[in-house]
Design a protein with these regions (language model features):
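Short intrinsically disordered coil segments
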Residues: 40, 56, 119-122
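Non-catalytic surface loops within mature trypsin-like serine protease
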Residues: 29, 43, 72, 109-111
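A short, N-terminal "cap"/entry segment at the start of jelly-roll beta-barrel domains
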Residues: 1-34, 116-122
Length: 122
């Protein structure tokens, strides 16, 4: 049995090449099974097409509105309280059509690792 751990994360939000802001809430090698981040997409912005290999993502919309495109499925409109499952390796992006920031939590299993991220844009 493992001991309970208290891990601290960097409290600073950062801007990504994907065109969204990320605040890592939990992502450590000590807990490889899961990571949690808060994502923020500014009004009018569409994130870059990308995949995350070997990682399942779940978005939980906190506030704002979004239009998600995953794989070849029709676009999905999202509002606060909605959940979105993104299978590992599926191309994806999200658009904020609203006038306020789109904020969502992103739960990754196993944890997000930069080496698994693939941009599909130039």
């Amino acid at each position: 049995m493992t001991k309970p751990q208290n891990n601290s994360t960097d409290p600073r939000e950062y801007f990504t090449d994907e065109r969204c802001h990320i605040l890592e809430l939990h992502n450590t090698a000590d807990d490889p099974g899961v990571s949690l981040a808060r994502a923020r997409v500014e009004p009018g912005v569409t994130t870059a097409w990308h995949t995350v290999e070997a990682t399942i993502e779940r978005y939980i919309i906190v506030s704002g509105t979004g239009i998600a495109e995953v794989g070849d499925a029709p676009a999905l409109s999202l509002i606060a309280g909605d959940h979105l499952l993104i299978p590992a390796g599926k191309k994806q992006r999200i658009h904020n059509p609203g006038s306020v920031d789109l904020i969502f939590h992103c739960i990754c299993t196993p944890r997000f690792e930069r080496r698994n991220y693939r941009s599909l844009e130039d």
